[in-house]
Amino acid sequence: MPRFYSISTTDFRPISFENVYLYGEYKKIKNFLVSNNQQELLKVLSIPSYKNNNIEWSASTNNEIKKLDEYSQTQQDKILSQYNEFLNSYNSFINALRSSKNQDNKNWGELLFSLIEGTANELFSDGENIFITWGWRLLDENSKKLIPVYNPPPSIAEDYPKEIDKEID
């Protein structure tokens, strides 16, 4: 699996859950998502590895992976739309876990909620699939927001003037 990105641990701090750094729990997270038929959510999560005070990220793809800002605005909008779809699915899954009567599911819901709530999530794409970094926070959380907010274009019906809706006598 090719590595496509690296972050220095001097600029970021790991997110922990119950005294465990989340980036070190990738295999457990992967197994849980696979056992719950959430492969589509799993493939968005980049694979972290710690090496020489850096976290190196890789993903399962044969295509070149680039940062969001390396794409045209049209392509960025498409990627951000994919990211919003991912967040909707991810949040639905998390909410189902957190509202479960099973304590183990509730714990997994809390862990997965913590996974991408940090300020250091960055968005990448290989032109078809999206990938995010996760499990880290910027040391200075006010310095920047790494994934811009996607505002979908208004629907065609919203573009028409309201006068068109009036009946003509």
What are the residue ranges of the model-derived segments?
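Cytosolic/nucleoplasmic/matrix-facing N-terminal domains/tails
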Residues: 1-168
